[in-house]
Design a protein with these regions (language model features):
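Phosphate-end processing signature that detects enzymes handling 5′-triphosphorylated RNA
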Residues: 1-160
Length: 160
């Protein structure tokens, strides 16, 4: 089991507006998400050191863990959403994946295009066989993490 923490917001990648702390609990191929609203009084600029320190403090106060959560990388992409006719399967396609990193709370925009398109299919486990039997493709199905890919391109050497 692994827990992954991230702050998610939509719109301008440089302005953190209406951020949500997302805790993603993974157990093999099964994921669970917990969403916690963060409420800064004003939108925060990603390239403002004081704003990032403020956000870090708010997150750590809400989590109350033994370890401190710190900003490491920021991943941005253009996402399209699709839903099956009966709404049993959701598909997302992420393109133009870019990554930047935080160095001493300063955001360094690396503008790395990770040169891939990520297609994710999301559905309840009970539909697993159905989905696999319906797919007609020559692609390898694998796990993918834009976060892990971003770390690979960053200067951070973090134990994963």
């Amino acid at each position: 089991r692994k827990n992954k923490f991230r702050v998610r917001w939509y719109g301008n990648k440089y302005i953190i507006k209406n951020p949500i702390l997302e805790i993603k609990k993974k157990n093999g191929w099964i994921n669970e998400k917990i969403l916690i609203s963060l409420k800064p009084k004003i939108p925060l600029k990603i390239n403002n050191k004081d704003a990032i320190i403020f956000l870090e403090k708010e997150i750590n106060n809400k989590l109350n863990l033994n370890k401190k959560i710190i900003p490491v990388v920021s991943t941005h992409y253009l996402r399209k959403y699709f839903v099956s006719e009966k709404s049993l399967i959701r598909i997302t396609i992420d393109r133009f994946v870019q990554s930047g990193e935080f160095f001493r709370y300063n955001f360094v925009n690396t503008n790395v295009d990770l040169n891939n398109i990520v297609l994710e299919m999301k559905y309840e486990k009970k539909y697993d066989d159905y989905v696999k039997n319906q797919l007609d493709h020559n692609y390898i199905i694998s796990k993918n993490s834009k976060f892990i890919n971003s770390l690979f391109y960053s200067s951070h050497k973090v134990k994963i």
